[in-house]
From Swiss-Prot:
SUPFAM superfamilies: NagB/RpiA/CoA transferase-like. It catalyses: alpha-D-glucosamine 6-phosphate + H2O = beta-D-fructose 6-phosphate + NH4(+). This is Glucosamine-6-phosphate deaminase. GO terms for cellular component: cytoplasm. Keywords: Allosteric enzyme, Carbohydrate metabolism, Hydrolase. Its EC number is 3.5.99.6. Homohexamer. Pathway: Amino-sugar metabolism; N-acetylneuraminate degradation; D-fructose 6-phosphate from N-acetylneuraminate: step 5/5. One of its GO terms (biological process) is carbohydrate metabolic process. It comes from Salmonella typhi.
Length: 266
């Protein structure tokens, strides 16, 4: 596992965006051979999306031959709702870059047959071979996507019941009213994430410090689903300074020395 220790949330977003752009450009995608990118929602990736849009406008990257799969979507929330992940992605990213509409894949939380929707999502991912890079965030309790604590590390795309803590955390997007936050969501599984060629997780803020410590220094444990990254051959965790407060000094020193050349100029 790589740990990229940075100072601020803005630096995390810029580093992540630069990494994505470098991966896309090195891949040299075409119509017949697209780059497949997994994407998250929430507050954490906003700085990365902003940086990606700026780099696109500067002519540094094109998304014409990029196919995206989003991590999750609320169940029962109309896609036109301002807090649906469909709306979030268009508002913060898709509407500002040159990605074709047919290349965008989002789970349908209003599908008449939820199980079929989840199966078809997995099948569509497999039809592209694999996701080349999956970017994600992490919850205070260590969840990735909506794989809440005790999720199977072999799980696939499915419906999940959201914990009360997750709904409280997300209520900030619903005028602070937890009762407006859906109780269920569709989410890619831990196994889906582990199938990706590379997984990059962004970690911001002191409230994520325990999750980061569990990911880097703890054991693989389904109560901290972020710890699944230890099983992945190409996992990258990009974090800000407040999120590292639970790490041992020698752990942080080790990764700072290891990644010194990769964090210059931010």
């Amino acid at each position: 596992m790589r740990l990229i220790p940075l100072s601020t949330a803005e630096q995390v977003g810029k580093w992540a965006a630069r990494h994505i752009v470098n991966r896309i450009n090195a891949f040299k995608p075409t119509t017949d051979r697209p780059f497949v990118l997994g994407l998250p929602t929430g507050g954490t990736p906003l700085t990365a999306y902003k940086a990606l849009v700026e780099m696109h406008k500067a002519g540094e990257v094109s998304f014409k031959h990029v196919v995206t799969f989003n991590m999750d979507e609320y169940v029962g929330l109309p896609k036109e709702h301002p807090e649906s992940y469909h709306s979030f992605m268009h508002r913060n990213f898709f509407d500002h870059v040159d990605i074709p509409a047919e290349n965008i894949n989002l789970l349908n939380g209003n599908a008449p047959d939820i199980d079929a929707e989840c199966r078809q999502y997995e099948e569509k991912i497999r039809s592209y071979g694999k996701i080349h890079l999956f970017m994600g965030g992490v919850g205070n309790d260590g969840h990735i996507a909506f794989n809440e604590p005790a999720s199977s590390l072999a799980s696939r795309t499915r419906i999940k019941t959201l914990t009360h803590d997750t709904r409280v955390a997300n209520s900030r997007f619903f005028d602070g009213d937890v009762n407006q936050v859906p109780k269920y969501a569709l989410t890619v599984g831990v196994g889906t994430l582990l199938d990706a060629e590379e997984v990059m997780i962004l970690v911001l803020g002191h409230q994520k410090a325990q999750a980061l410590q569990a990911a880097v220094e703890g054991n693989v444990n389904h109560m901290w689903t972020i710890s699944c990254l230890q099983l992945h051959p190409k996992a990258v965790v990009v974090c800000d300074e407040p999120s590292t407060m639970e790490l041992k000094v020698k752990t942080l020193k080790y990764f700072n020395e290891l990644e010194a050349e990769n964090i210059k100029g931010l």
